Regions:
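Short coil-to-helix segment of the ABC ATPase nucleotide-binding domain corresponding to the Q-loop/switch region
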Residues: 9-16
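Conserved ABC ATPase signature
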Residues: 49-53, 57-59
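A short, proline-enriched helix->beta-strand linker immediately N-terminal to the Walker B motif
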Residues: 68-72
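Catalytic Walker B motif of ABC-type/P-loop ATPase nucleotide-binding domains
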Residues: 74-77
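Helix N-cap at the start of a conserved alpha-helix in ABC-type nucleotide-binding domains
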Residues: 85-87
Length: 140
């Protein structure tokens, strides 16, 4: 998987990119980047380059970059693809934490078993039709 990280730049720079584009003040950038990296468990990798990280760590850098500017909506397309089950659950727990802090999280995935463990509303797309998860329908 390609996480669209800038290979010649540090993890700090990769996560800071949206804030730099927005014109955020340098001191605020440092605070927010460190906060985002701390949330994804990579604060100790701030000076590393993407090529030195595992695929799962690169995935989490991408997530940190996506949430560093506190978006109201986070779209995640196959965020757990090619990750082991434990790391997949860690990432879903991160999304749950973001949601608990006011970010709407929309996840597209083929891993229905993983999603079924989450307590939030899920929809299924099958044969071009959207339907509510059967388990959710049973509880309504």
């Amino acid at each position: 998987q390609n996480h669209r990280l800038l290979e010649r730049h540090t993890i700090f720079d990769n996560v800071a990119l949206p804030l730099i584009i927005e014109g955020t003040h340098h001191k605020q950038i440092e605070k927010r980047v460190h906060g985002a990296l701390d949330k994804v468990g990579l604060l100790d990798k701030v000076k590393c380059h993407p090529s030195t990280l595992s695929g799962g760590e690169q995935q989490r850098v991408g997530i940190a970059r996506a949430i560093v500017n506190s978006p109201p909506l986070l779209l995640a397309d196959e965020p757990t693809g090619n990750l082991d089950p434990e790391l997949s659950m860690d990432i879903l727990r991160l999304f749950e934490e973001f949601n608990n802090h006011g970010t709407t999280v929309l996840i597209a995935t083929h891993d229905l078993g993983l999603i079924s463990r989450m307590k939030y509303r899920s929809l299924t797309l099958k044969d071009g039709r959207m339907s509510q998860d059967p388990l959710a329908e049973a509880t309504l």
